[in-house]
């Protein structure tokens, strides 16, 4: 150790190799302070060495002392060969390397420029291409790894692209196989990893597996043929992708030229979707039976060469999806649903027959298919094979096609395929059972309850006159007196469960109740008078209720139900007491004349029967229970909820009025006591 003057730090003369050893100790995990204390230099100096590590490594290799030291170590054989090459190659070779070392504006890594030449013979990886010789001292080897200065190789590549001479180069994605060009970032890593060929990637995955998986994903994303997934089209497609270096044949020249036309003169930006499009476009030029089987290759050969890169309009149904559907049907026991694979009869057919198309879709539009209502479409016979046309395949997804064919067979009424009349009857009955469907389509036959200003009058005002004339309540929303489609029949007391009236059930119940009522008393001669009075009463009530709303109690739906119960016209009552009214008719025949002369004063008297808001709320709660048990398709759940909120608000106001009355009474008593 050399000591300087007093007061200065002790200085040591360290070689570049010693500095590199110190830096390596830091890389191995030691702290800079401990290393600096060990070698006797300040920590700031060691920190400066770490910043100039690349330069120090280059200087250590240049020194003769380092070369002599490395000759004694068996693990540094590569560095010895490099030092010997530098010592014995002569000045021109050294000047060439120094000039090339300045490439990149001084940012070139010394390690890369120095180690590029010996890595070839050590690892057996040819980085120079097919037309260059491998030599340790050649400057072309160094520049070949950098891909930047030698423009003559670029012109050679452009010439080779036109004639298809060399397709086996690893690092050039323009000339490699399509599957390997799709993963060109991974293939370029093979030069850095030092592994030979494409057998293993730095990601610990086989390049063949990556190429195969990427091809399958490309075909899946592009809605391409998935025969390789289902093994229906053979494994030839996957096997062709596993070949990293395919043999040169006559089909390589047009394939390479098409690829250059698509990508232009620049480097190709190949993605997974572009790969699938290129394979779909150029699959007709491959050898027979190479991709997707013989049938698909014939179909692609019929395409024009200038076809767009999008989806083919005449593409058949995906075979893998067909295989998946068959497996699903096998699990469900529906193997006879399809008799043959749905594909168009001819690939070039422009339009499909309308008869076959109407088996799948029951509307004429093929461009915008709307979801069918569950109860309306005709069921498809299981034995018939539906035809999926090219327009269907192009304009709608495969799952929608599967739903239209497979879901139609699971619809209600599947057992009535032999009789069209029974199927129509079942569909109508199911339409009445579906409340949502009846709500959506009830405006076709009669006006909607929401369009008229009469929300609750449907079940309140029943048939005028004696109870034994008609068993159905009148629908005030329909002014044509035809309420058979919209009104509900009151259920008997034995079964309080909800039921949905269909045309058949309502007709049967109507006939049955008419027979019972005819036994109770004859009233056939009064039906004209009853209909006449019915119209008058309805008009009077309309004018009174919806043109003169004088009070909240008079306009509330709860009070309307009470008026109907207090009036002699009591047909629409709760299911629990409807049987009582049918079996015990009251003598109301003498009141017909009085009812025909009813006026607004009498209506005021009817509403005046309700003494207070609390009584109205009580009757409203009874009517709400009846509404919840009612199964009329014209009464929606939203209307019931609105009536609940209305009744609740009336109840709160009634309680508030009652509290105010009680408080006012207490104040009066207090005032009296004070007096």
Swiss-Prot record:
Q: Where is the HTH psq-type domain?
A: 5-56
The record's subcellular locations are: Nucleus
Superkingdom of the organism of origin: Eukaryota
Listed Pfam families: CENP-B_N (PF04218)
What are the GO BP annotations of this UniProt entry? antennal development; compound eye development; regulation of DNA-templated transcription; segment specification
Q: Where is the composition biased (Polar residues)?
A: 499-508
Q: What is this protein called?
A: Protein distal antenna
Q: Which segments show compositional bias classed as Low complexity?
A: 339-368, 479-493, 559-579
State what this protein does: Probable transcription factor with a role in the retinal determination (RD) network. Contributes to differentiation of antenna-specific characteristics.
Query: Which keywords does the record carry?
Result: Developmental protein, DNA-binding, Nucleus, Phosphoprotein, Transcription, Transcription regulation
Does the record's keyword annotation contain Phosphoprotein? yes
Gene Ontology cellular component terms for the protein in this record: nucleus
Q: Which residues bind DNA?
A: 32-52
GO MF annotation: an example? DNA binding
Report the InterPro entries cross-referenced here: Homeodomain-like_sf (IPR009057), HTH_Psq (IPR007889), RD_transcriptional_regulator (IPR051839), WH-like_DNA-bd_sf (IPR036388)
Q: Which organism is it from?
A: Aedes aegypti (Yellowfever mosquito)
| Comp. bias (Acidic residues) | 513-528
Where along the chain is composition biased (Pro residues)? Answer: 369-384
UniProt keyword Transcription present: yes
């Amino acid at each position: 150790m050399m000591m300087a003057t007093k007061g200065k730090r002790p200085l040591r003369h360290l070689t570049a190799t010693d500095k590199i050893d110190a830096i390596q100790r830091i890389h191995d995990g030691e702290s800079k302070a401990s290393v600096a204390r060990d070698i006797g230099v300040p920590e700031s100096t060691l920190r400066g060495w770490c910043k100039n590590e690349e330069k120090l490594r280059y200087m250590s290799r240049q020194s003769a002392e380092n070369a002599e030291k490395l000759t004694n170590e068996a693990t540094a054989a590569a560095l010895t060969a490099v030092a010997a090459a530098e010592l014995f190659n002569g000045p021109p070779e050294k000047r060439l390397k120094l000039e090339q070392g300045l490439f990149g504006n001084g940012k070139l890594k010394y390690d890369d420029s120095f180690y590029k030449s010996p890595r070839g013979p050590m690892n057996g990886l040819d980085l120079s291409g097919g037309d260059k010789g491998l030599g340790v001292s050649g400057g072309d080897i160094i520049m070949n790894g950098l891909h930047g200065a030698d423009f003559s190789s670029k012109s050679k590549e452009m010439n080779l692209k036109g004639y298809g001479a060399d397709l086996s180069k690893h690092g050039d994605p323009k000339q490699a196989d399509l599957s390997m060009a799709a993963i060109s970032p991974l293939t370029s890593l093979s030069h850095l990893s030092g592994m030979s060929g494409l057998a293993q990637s730095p990601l610990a995955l086989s390049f063949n597996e990556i190429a195969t998986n990427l091809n399958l994903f490309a075909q899946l994303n592009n809605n391409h043929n998935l025969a390789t997934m289902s093994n229906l089209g053979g494994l030839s497609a996957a096997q062709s992708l596993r070949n990293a270096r395919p043999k040169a044949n006559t089909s390589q020249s047009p394939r390479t030229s098409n690829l250059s036309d698509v990508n232009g003169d620049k480097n190709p930006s190949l993605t997974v979707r572009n790969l699938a499009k290129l394979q779909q476009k150029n699959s007709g030029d491959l050898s027979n039976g190479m991709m997707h089987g013989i049938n698909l290759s014939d179909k692609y050969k019929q395409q024009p060469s200038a076809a767009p890169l999008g989806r083919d309009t005449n593409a058949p149904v995906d075979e893998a999806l067909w295989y998946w559907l068959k497996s699903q049907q096998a699990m469900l026991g529906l193997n006879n649903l399809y008799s043959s694979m749905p594909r168009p009869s001819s690939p070039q057919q422009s339009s499909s027959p309308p008869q076959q198309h109407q088996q799948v879709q029951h509307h004429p539009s093929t461009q915008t298919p709307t979801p069918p209502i569950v109860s309306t479409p005709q069921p498809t016979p299981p034995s018939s094979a539906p035809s999926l046309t090219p327009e269907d395949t192009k304009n709608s997804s495969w799952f929608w096609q599967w739903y239209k064919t497979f879901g139609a067979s699971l619809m209600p009424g599947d057992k009535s395929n032999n009789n069209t009349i029974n199927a129509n009857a079942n569909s109508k009955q199911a339409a009445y059972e579906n409340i949502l469907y009846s709500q959506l389509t009830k405006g076709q036959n009669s006006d909607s309850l929401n369009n008229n200003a009469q929300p609750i009058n449907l079940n309140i005002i029943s048939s005028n006159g004696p109870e034994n004339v008609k068993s159905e309540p009148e629908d005030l929303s329909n002014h044509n007196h035809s309420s058979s489609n919209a009104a509900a029949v009151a259920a008997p007391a034995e079964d309080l469960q909800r039921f949905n009236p269909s045309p058949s059930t309502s007709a049967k119940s109507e006939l049955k109740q008419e027979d019972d009522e005819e036994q109770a008393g004859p009233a056939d001669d009064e039906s004209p008078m009853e209909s006449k009075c019915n119209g008058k009463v309805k008009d009077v009530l309309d004018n009174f209720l919806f043109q003169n709303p004088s009070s909240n109690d008079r306009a509330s739906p709860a009070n309307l139900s009470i008026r109907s119960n207090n009036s002699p016209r009591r047909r629409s009552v709760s299911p629990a007491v409807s049987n009582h009214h049918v079996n015990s008719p009251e003598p109301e025949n003498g009141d017909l004349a009085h009812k025909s002369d009813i006026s607004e004063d009498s209506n005021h008297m009817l509403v005046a029967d309700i003494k207070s808001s609390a009584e109205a709320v009580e009757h409203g709660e009874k009517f709400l229970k009846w509404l919840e048990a009612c199964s009329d398709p014209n009464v929606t759940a939203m209307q019931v909820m609105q009536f609940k909120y209305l009744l609740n608000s009336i109840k709160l106001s009634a309680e508030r009025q009652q509290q105010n009355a009680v408080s006012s009474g207490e104040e009066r008593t207090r005032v009296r006591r004070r007096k």
